[in-house]
Amino acid sequence: MTKSAELYQKAQQTIPGGVNSPVRAFNGVGGSPIFVERADGAFIFDADGKAYIDYVGSWGPMILGHNHAVIREAVIEAAQRGLSFGAPTEMEIKMAELVSELVPSMEQLRMVSSGTEATMSAIRLARGFTGRDKILKFEGCYHGHADSLLVKAGSGALTLGQPSSPGVPADFAKHTLTATFNDLDSVRELFAANKGEIACIIVEPVAGNMNCIPPVEGFHEGLREICDQEGALLIFDEVMTGFRVALGGAQAHYNIKPDLTTLGKVIGGGMPVGAFGGRKEVMQYIAPTGPVYQAGTLSGNPVAMAAGYACLTLLREEGNEKRLASKTKHLADGFKSLAAQHGIPLVVNQVGGMFGFFFTEQEQITCYEDVTKCDIERFKRFFHLMIDHGVYLAPSAFEASFTSLAHGSKEIEATLEAADRCFAILAAESK
């Protein structure tokens, strides 16, 4: 038995399921999760000392690579001055100014401690600002584990949402409407059936929680137009895409200006940080300047702010955005080409520094229903083959994978060599 397997057994005695976030348990791929001992650059090292080229990157934050020296030193320096004050600091101002400069639609913003907290607060603000209760999300898009957002679609676009987790009251879930991603008609139908009742649309501009699904042409423009016509706010959940799809986020990549934006992951440089912000007139509605309450003891934590500021300062250096996108495209194109050579049907999507692939005969993947038609069992097999070959991909067919600036040509080519061998095994097994 490996040390990771031993630790997993031990963890299950005191931690529900042995993990502190469900996807880490490998339920989506089977087997026991690897327990990580340390990480550096493009690599993670498990409890048995085995190295893996990492394409999870802590689910997105590690855009500069693991254990970056500048971020590490920023954390140490900040920690030496104190871990938490519960009072405002100058670094919070510097951080807010930098984020607003990089993401201009965020005229004002507030720091929180997680992406879930950011989306939860943005939803409350949208409801308070508009005086409306209902929100619209998309099937397959994940926005954290707040009650309003743990809802899936019913049978048909006009069906009221049903809770997808015990503990979410149906009476509460009914205020969440679910449309089909990349389908503007489903959005229009919901607005028509709930005239004057919808406070906001919240959307992952690139859906990263049903793997990696970009918007079809005109989709985000259509959402912007519908919100303007209906008096609803458009919220871009850029927890995953922020600073990764482009330096200014997916909204810069697609040239769309949302009313509110939520951020997480990259903004903390590996520390627990989230943020929400947007138009000044909307943000002024949050306490203490407005009636919508939001607070947090650790919001704007000085150590987390130092890490985030160091990360974004490095990330904005000239050439980094293009370099990240270029190496990710090279990797994605390589996966697609190798799969084709071995006769493996594969759809590969890539935007900026995130990518995903689907084992399917379908020509393209545009929504959650398309994802459910993919060969999940073949993904599981491929995942474990890649693990055996020293490559760590997202352990779920419904999660995107990520590159970092620390992934060099050596790591990319080693990954493609591993993929070549794994596709060959899949092809042989299917004969």
From Swiss-Prot:
Recorded catalytic activity of this chain's protein: (S)-4-amino-5-oxopentanoate = 5-aminolevulinate
Pfam families assigned to the protein according to its UniProt record, in alphabetical order: Aminotran_3
Alphabetic keyword roster: Cytoplasm, Isomerase, Porphyrin biosynthesis, Pyridoxal phosphate
PTM-bearing positions, type N6-(pyridoxal phosphate)lysine: 265
InterPro entries: 4pyrrol_synth_GluAld_NH2Trfase, Aminotrans_3, Aminotrans_3_PPA_site, PyrdxlP-dep_Trfase, PyrdxlP-dep_Trfase_major, PyrdxlP-dep_Trfase_small
Compartments where found: Cytoplasm
Annotated Gene Ontology cellular component terms: cytoplasm
Family: Belongs to the class-III pyridoxal-phosphate-dependent aminotransferase family. HemL subfamily.
Oligomer status and interactors: Homodimer.
Alphabetical list of NCBIfam families matching this protein: hemL, PRK00062.1
Name this polypeptide is given: Glutamate-1-semialdehyde 2,1-aminomutase
Species annotation: Vibrio vulnificus (strain CMCP6)
